[in-house]
């Protein structure tokens, strides 16, 4: 029997201690010399002694050879060739460039010692994409400095322009110090936060510069101008900054995969705007005073700096007078864009996160569950050739992982270094030569590949940013009866499949495994005198094989596997005619019962002890799952109401991940909203004025929706972040205008004409901050698909925020009856 052979082999493997011989002076370890060091030694192992003199060796009854593990469990294919893959992961602490450089030195050293027929190629390098992201940061930073300097020079003059521009590098340096202090690495999301903050950093500086210029113009000394500016602005600027900080804090303190993904972004934004406040209050007034002492600037009238045009000023004064004569006019003009944004929100496509801006796309395939790794590899080759022959995407290189998950080339890829997967599954990454060609033609390519492979599950898609999402549309049905769960799953699968843009669907319980089932009769086994346990062990050894020892080969320990020889073309026959020794010689296993091929569900999943059936759907590349969810919403609700007693349904997929992330964000946002209200009331010393500022926050959300609509962008998590950023910007401008109006109103009861002059005084720095912010965000529209929703929302929204500050705030102040009519 296989059991007897196994015992014989194990008994001759003497790689173990044989005891210790000791006396009062010393101890000696007793060990046997290793007797299995080659295939020949394994072949000569005695198995049985016959007639007290004849020895049956293993080579007499078995074929012994040294070969790779069969069947193969996982295969790696690179550019159509089966090769060996090595993945190296660095720790979080070292810089990726330094780590990659050190790894390359090791590889180069090894490459020089390899024979000619063996080569080493680098197929993926994370530092390349990190460098691109830093290049974007440097480019955005350079453009931001250019726009800030140019716009500030035009509107404010040379001295304010130099000072305001200096805030950018100083603030970024403070952020770098902060990241180092809290241990936040510079990666995609944290760098994104710095890029977002570039449009917000100089607002406080411009406001302080303009206020200082105003104080000097009315005759105050340098010292008094500094004191008055700081005294007047420290509370409103701190309140505005605190409002922005509280708006971003839910992203830092929330829970869930999305919050975890963008938490670094919120941290760098908070550090950026906080540093800009500190620099604006402490550094800007001092630099302005020093600038006045420089001989080159002494003859320049500080208030005359910047662009002046009396004709435009008179027309603007007339417009403000007309608007505030009937405050409803100013209100209607200022709220028209936000209201339009809210009305257009229902037309915005909804996604979770935008696509990755990398020249990579993926193809995942799943064959029937009984498919071997070799069969999956064969199908992977066919699909690879279909991609190359289509000519739709020019491929630079590609790699496939068959029978296991791919390594974590992106943070949202599940599997990583763990060897998880099945023989019937393959995952691949294709690197395109042209990113834009890839994005344009990927939808057509996905339909082509799916149409050519209707018998298997194929997913062709680009990589998305954000946390991992396993399927676009997903539901889980809970219940007790597997048969009922299967029927319900098939019914729900039809509902999902009927929706537009669905490329394929999958019900977990419909995943059928083909098995060889042996129906053994207990009576036959008992009459034969065979131990049932030995029978099962014989079956296992004959098919899967058992490890019976190891062979030392130099410094390697190779396992010895005992396995039966099966005919690959007759699996059922090999199982039926397996021989089992008995009292009367031997018996075929078919003598103890019947063998037949069966098809049964291969998966039984439970959650909290309850059976469940997962039903998933995938949409075509280039389409959004939100449209599919909206289409099937009523049918799914009807399906839910018709479920049998004891059965329930839960939505998963992208919708669940998106919902969990937004729920976590909004739940923690309530706490910070209360803190924002408290801070505004304390800063403004008025509930009504705090209410006006809060209404500005609501209007700014509508402006962000309008920006997304104009830019033809989807509303997702990045759009939500854009709305939060725009809230901070709008409140900042509005609080400053309101503080200027309050400053004049506290001296006396002002008239509408005087109100117009206060607004004109605030206009220069409001327009300057808006244009510099626009200049900071506009380049991002062309920089990356990841930033586009943010860039469009902020770029268009900031223009509406200007009208809100200059028209809405004064009009509401008039309604508070704080002026003379």
Where are these regions (language model features)?
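Extracytoplasmic/periplasmic membrane-proximal domains and adjacent transmembrane bundles
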Residues: 1-146, 209, 486, 493-672, ...
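Solvent-exposed, membrane-proximal periplasmic/extracellular interface segments of envelope transport
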Residues: 1-14, 31-37, 375-468, 523-541
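Hydrophobic alpha-helical transmembrane segments in multi-pass membrane proteins
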Residues: 15, 139-152, 156, 172, ...
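Helix-loop junctions and hydrophobic alpha-helical segments within the transmembrane domains
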Residues: 123, 130, 134, 209, ...
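Hydrophobic transmembrane alpha-helices and their membrane-interface caps
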Residues: 146, 150-213, 678-750, 755-761, ...
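Transmembrane alpha-helices and their membrane-interface boundaries in multi-pass membrane transporters
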Residues: 198-210, 233-253, 260-303, 428, ...
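Signature of alpha-helical transmembrane segments and their immediate interfacial
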Residues: 233, 302-354, 400, 475, ...
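Transmembrane helices with small-residue packing motifs
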Residues: 251-260, 335-371, 413, 460, ...
């Amino acid at each position: 029997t296989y059991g007897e052979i196994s015992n014989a082999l194990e008994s001759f493997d003497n790689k173990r201690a044989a005891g210790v011989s000791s006396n009062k002076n010393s101890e000696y370890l007793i060990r046997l010399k290793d007797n299995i060091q080659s295939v020949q030694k394994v072949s000569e192992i005695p198995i049985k002694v016959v007639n007290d003199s004849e020895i049956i060796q293993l080579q007499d009854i078995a074929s012994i050879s040294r070969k790779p593990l069969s069947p193969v469990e996982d295969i790696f294919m690179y550019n159509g060739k089966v090769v060996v893959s090595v993945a190296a992961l660095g720790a979080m602490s070292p810089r990726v460039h330094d780590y990659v450089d050190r790894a390359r030195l090791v590889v180069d050293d090894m490459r020089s010692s390899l024979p000619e027929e063996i080569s080493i190629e680098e197929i993926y390098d994370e530092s390349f994409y990190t460098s691109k992201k830093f290049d974007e940061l440097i480019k955005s930073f350079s453009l931001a400095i250019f726009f800030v300097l140019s716009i500030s020079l035009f509107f404010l003059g040379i001295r304010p322009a130099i000072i305001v521009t200096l805030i950018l590098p100083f603030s970024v340096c403070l952020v770098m110090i902060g990241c180092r202090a809290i241990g936040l690495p510079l990666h995609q999301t944290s760098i994104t936060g710095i890029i977002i903050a570039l449009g917000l950093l100089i607002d406080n500086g411009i406001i302080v510069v303009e206020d200082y210029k105003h104080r000097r113009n009315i005759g105050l000394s340098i010292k008094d101008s500094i004191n008055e500016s700081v005294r007047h602005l420290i509370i409103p600027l701190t309140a505005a900054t605190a409002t922005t900080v509280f708006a971003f804090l839910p992203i830092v303190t929330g829970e869930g995969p999305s919050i975890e993904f963008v938490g670094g972004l919120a941290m760098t934004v908070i550090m950026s705007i906080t540093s800009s406040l500190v620099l604006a209050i402490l550094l800007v007034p001092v630099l302005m005073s020093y600038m006045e002492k420089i001989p080159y600037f002494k003859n320049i009238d500080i208030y005359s700096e910047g662009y002046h045009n009396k004709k435009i000023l008179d027309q603007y004064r007339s417009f403000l007078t007309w608007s505030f004569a009937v405050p409803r006019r100013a209100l209607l003009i200022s709220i028209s864009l936000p209201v339009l944004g809210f009305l257009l929100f229902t037309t915005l496509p909804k996604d979770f996160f935008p696509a990755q801006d990398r020249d990579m796309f993926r193809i995942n395939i799943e064959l029937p569950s009984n498919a071997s790794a070799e069969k999956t590899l064969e199908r992977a080759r066919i699909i690879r050739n279909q991609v190359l022959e289509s000519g739709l995407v020019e491929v630079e290189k590609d790699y496939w992982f068959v029978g296991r998950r791919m390594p974590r080339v992106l943070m949202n890829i599940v599997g990583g270094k763990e060897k998880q997967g099945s023989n019937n599954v393959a995952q691949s990454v294709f690197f395109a030569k042209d990113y834009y060609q890839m994005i344009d033609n990927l939808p057509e390519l996905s339909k082509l590949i799916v149409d050519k492979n209707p018998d298997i599950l194929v997913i062709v898609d680009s990589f998305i940013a954000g946390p991992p999402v396993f399927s676009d549309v997903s539901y889980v049905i809970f219940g007790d009866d597997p048969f009922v769960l299967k029927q319900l799953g098939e019914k729900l699968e039809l509902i999902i499949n009927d929706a537009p843009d669905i490329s394929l669907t999958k019900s977990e319980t419909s995943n059928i495994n083909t098995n060889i089932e042996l129906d053994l009769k207990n009576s036959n086994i008992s009459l034969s005198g065979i131990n049932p346990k030995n029978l099962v062990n014989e079956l296992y050894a004959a098919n899967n094989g058992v490890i019976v020892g190891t062979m030392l080969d130099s410094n390697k320990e190779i396992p010895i596997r005992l396995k039966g020889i099966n005919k690959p073309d007759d699996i059922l026959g090999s199982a039926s005619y397996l021989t089992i020794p008995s009292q009367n010689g031997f018996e075929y296993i078919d003598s103890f019962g019947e063998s037949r091929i069966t098809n049964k569900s291969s998966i039984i999943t439970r959650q909290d002890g309850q059976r469940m059936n997962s039903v998933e759907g995938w949409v075509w590349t280039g389409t959004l799952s939100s449209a599919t969810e909206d289409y099937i919403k009523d049918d799914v609700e009807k399906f839910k109401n018709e479920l049998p007693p004891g059965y329930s349904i839960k939505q998963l997929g992208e919708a669940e991940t998106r919902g969990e992330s937004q729920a976590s964000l909004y739940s923690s946002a309530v706490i910070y909203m209360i803190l924002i209200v408290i801070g505004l009331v304390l800063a403004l010393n008025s509930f009504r004025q705090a209410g006006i500022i809060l209404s500005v926050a609501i209007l700014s959300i509508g402006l962000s929706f309008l920006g997304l609509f104009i830019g033809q962008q989807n509303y997702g998590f990045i759009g939500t972040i854009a709305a939060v950023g725009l809230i901070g910007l709008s409140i900042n401008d509005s609080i400053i205008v309101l503080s200027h109006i309050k400053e004049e109103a506290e001296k006396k009861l002002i008239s509408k004409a005087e109100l117009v002059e206060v607004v004109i005084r605030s206009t220069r720095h409001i327009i300057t901050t808006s244009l510099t912010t626009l200049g900071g965000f506009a380049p991002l529209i062309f920089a990356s698909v990841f930033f586009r929703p943010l860039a469009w929302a902020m770029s268009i929204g900031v223009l509406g925020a200007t009208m809100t500050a200059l028209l809405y705030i004064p009009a509401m102040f008039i309604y508070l009856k704080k002026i003379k009519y």
